Amino acid sequence: MCRCRHPSCITETVFPPLTWLDSEWDEICSLPVARNETHDPSGPRAPVSSMRLGPRSRPYHHGTARLRGSPNCSRDSSSAAT
């Protein structure tokens, strides 16, 4: 699953499908982690940063998974087409 170290990152990235590839988890998790590591997680900006990331990250993450075409995603789309 997700290898995020920050609690805010874990809560943001725990919702996507479990069919994601490890590489997708690593890359996506590294985005919010890199942002949060620039300041103290316990600081006042941490919750604000995670809240701003939330709404934007959801459609972006789902879109990325589909564009990447992971084996599970392509399998679902091909079976639905036939």
Swiss-Prot record:
Induction or repression: Expression is positively regulated by the leucinostatins biosynthesis cluster-specific transcription regulator lcsF.
Feature: compositional bias, Polar residues = 71-82
Q: Where is this region: Disordered?
A: 34-82
Its annotated function is as follows: Part of the gene cluster that mediates the biosynthesis of the lipopeptide antibiotics leucinostatins that show extensive biological activities, including antimalarial, antiviral, antibacterial, antifungal, and antitumor activities, as well as phytotoxic. The function of lcsM within the leucinostatins biosynthesis has not been identified yet.
| Official protein name in the record | Leucinostatins biosynthesis cluster protein M
